[in-house]
C-alpha cells in the first residue's frame, strides 16, 4: 500500500483504474451529469438515438389517425350527394366514387396539409418532453453565421434540387416510372381553387419547413449529436430523406437534409436552416406553378422541357455556391453544435461503438426505415407510367 502513496501523502490511483472511455468537454452539462458513470452515459446516448428514430414513428402514427378521421368526416359529408345523384349505385360503385372524389386535388391537399400539420406538432411535443435532453429555446438562438453564408446555402439548395431533378428525369427516361403516385402528386399540386392553393402554399412553404426543421435539425440531429457531429448530420439527413416515404423524394430529401443540417450546425441555430428550407420549398412550388400549372396549359409538353432547362441552370448556380460555401466554412467538426447541454467526448474506439453501430441496433430506427421504405415500395406499384 505504501507504494501507492505519493510524496504529498496522497493516495495515487493507478492509471488503469481511471475511466478512460469518456471525458467531458468544456460546454455546460446537465445538472448532476458529473456523477454519471460511463455505463449511464452510454445508455443516455443510446436513448437519444431511440428517440431520434421515434420521431418518424410518431409522425406517421398521428398522420394515419388524422387521415382516417378526415376520411370518415369527408365520407359523411359527400355520401348523401353521391346517393342522391344516382340512387341505383351499388356499394362497390359508391366506394369507387367516394375514393375518386377524395383523390381530387382540393380534398387531397386539405387532408394532407391538415393531417401532416397536426402529426408534426404532436410528434415534436412527445419527443421533446419525453426525451428531456435539452432546452427548446437553445434551438432558436441568434445564428452565429454571416448572412453571406446563409445566402450561399440558399443558392446551394438550387443546385441540390437541380441535381435531383436531373437524376429523376434520367430514371424516368430509363424505366418509364415517374416515382410518385397520382394521389401523392395531387396532394402537392396546384388546383384552380384559390383557397386550396393558399392552404397548399401556407403548409408547404411556411408550416412544413418550420416544423420539419424543429423535428430533424432541432430534435433528431441534436439527439444524435452528443458523440460525433458528422455522424449526427448524416444520420439525421437519412431520417429526413426516409420521412418522405417515396423514392422520388428520399434521395432529394437526404441531400437537402445534409445542407440544412450543415448550415444549422455552423450557425448554431435552426433559424438559419428554416430560412433555407423555406427557400427550397418556395423554389420548388414556384417552378411547379409556372411550368406545370400555367405554361403546361398553353404550350403543352414544351413546358416540361423549359422546366428541365431551369433546373439545369439552378444546378450550375447552386453548384458554384456550394463550392464557395464549403471552401469558406469547411467541414463539420466537434465545435459545431446547436444546443450545449448534451455533449460528450469519447475515445475513438468507443466513439465508433456509439455512432453507427449503436444506431443500427436502435429498434425505432429500423421500424421507421421499414415503414418508410415499405411505403415507397408500395408506391412503385401505383406510380404514374410516363
Give residue ranges: language-model regions.
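Hydrophobic alpha-helical membrane-insertion segments
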Residues: 56-75, 151-167, 265, 271-279, ...
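Contiguous mid-protein beta-loop-alpha structural module that forms a pocket-lining wall or clamp
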Residues: 224, 232-286, 294
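Hydrophobic alpha-helical transmembrane segments
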Residues: 53-57, 113-114, 150-155, 198, ...
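N-terminal, membrane-interfacial amphipathic/helix-forming hydrophobic leader that caps
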Residues: 1-142, 284-386
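Juxtamembrane helix-loop-helix connectors linking adjacent transmembrane helices
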Residues: 83-84, 88, 97, 105-108, ...
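Aromatic-anchored segments of alpha-helical transmembrane domains
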Residues: 64-65, 158-162, 237-245, 279-288, ...
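Hydrophobic core segments of transmembrane alpha-helices in multi-pass, intramembrane catalytic enzymes
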Residues: 116-123, 200-204, 253-257, 318
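Function-critical hydrophobic alpha-helical transmembrane segments in multi-pass membrane proteins
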Residues: 159-162, 185-250, 255
Amino acid at each position: 500500500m505504501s507504494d501507492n502513496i505519493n510524496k504529498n501523502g496522497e493516495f495515487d490511483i493507478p492509471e488503469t483504474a481511471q475511466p478512460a472511455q469518456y471525458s467531458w468537454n468544456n460546454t455546460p452539462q446537465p445538472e448532476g451529469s458529473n456523477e454519471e458513470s460511463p455505463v449511464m452515459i452510454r445508455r443516455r446516448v443510446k436513448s437519444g438515438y431511440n428517440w431520434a428514430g421515434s420521431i418518424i414513428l410518431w409522425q406517421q402514427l398521428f398522420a394515419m389517425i388524422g387521415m382516417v378521421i378526415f376520411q370518415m368526416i369527408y365520407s359523411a359529408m359527400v355520401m348523401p350527394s353521391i346517393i342522391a345523384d344516382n340512387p341505383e349505385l351499388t356499394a362497390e360503385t359508391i366506394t369507387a366514387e367516394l375514393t375518386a372524389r377524395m383523390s381530387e386535388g382540393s380534398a387531397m391537399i386539405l387532408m394532407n396539409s391538415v393531417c401532416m400539420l397536426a402529426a408534426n406538432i404532436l410528434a415534436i411535443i412527445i419527443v421533446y418532453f419525453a426525451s428531456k435532453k435539452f432546452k427548446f429555446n437553445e434551438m432558436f438562438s441568434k445564428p452565429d453565421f454571416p448572412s453571406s453564408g446563409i445566402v450561399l446555402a440558399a443558392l446551394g439548395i438550387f443546385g441540390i434540387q437541380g441535381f435531383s431533378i436531373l437524376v429523376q428525369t434520367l430514371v424516368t427516361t430509363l424505366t418509364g416510372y415517374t416515382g410518385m403516385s397520382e394521389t401523392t402528386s395531387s396532394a402537392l399540386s396546384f388546383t384552380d381553387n384559390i383557397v386550396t392553393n393558399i392552404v397548399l402554399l401556407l403548409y408547404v412553404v411556411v408550416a412544413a419547413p418550420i416544423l420539419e426543421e424543429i423535428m430533424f435539425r432541432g430534435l433528431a440531429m441534436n439527439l444524435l449529436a452528443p458523440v460525433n457531429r458528422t455522424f449526427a448530420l448524416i444520420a439525421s439527413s437519412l431520417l429526413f430523406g426516409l420521412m418522405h416515404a417515396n423514392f422520388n423524394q428520399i434521395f432529394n430529401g437526404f441531400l437537402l437534409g445534409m445542407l440544412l443540417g450543415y448550415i444549422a450546425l455552423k450557425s448554431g441555430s435552426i433559424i438559419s436552416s428554416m430560412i433555407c428550407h423555406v427557400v427550397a420549398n418556395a423554389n420548388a412550388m414556384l417552378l411547379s406553378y409556372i411550368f406545370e400549372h400555367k405554361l403546361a396549359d398553353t404550350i403543352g409538353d414544351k413546358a416540361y422541357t423549359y422546366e428541365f432547362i431551369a433546373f439545369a441552370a439552378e444546378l450550375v448556380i447552386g453548384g458554384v455556391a456550394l463550392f464557395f460555401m464549403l471552401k469558406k466554412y469547411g467541414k463539420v467538426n466537434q465545435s459545431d453544435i446547436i444546443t450545449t447541454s448534451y455533449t460528450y467526448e469519447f475515445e475513438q474506439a468507443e466513439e465508433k461503438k456509439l455512432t453507427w453501430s449503436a444506431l443500427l441496433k436502435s429498434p425505432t430506427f429500423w421500424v421507421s426505415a421499414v415503414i418508410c421504405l415499405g411505403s415507397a415500395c408500395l408506391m412503385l406499384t401505383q406510380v404514374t407510367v410516363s
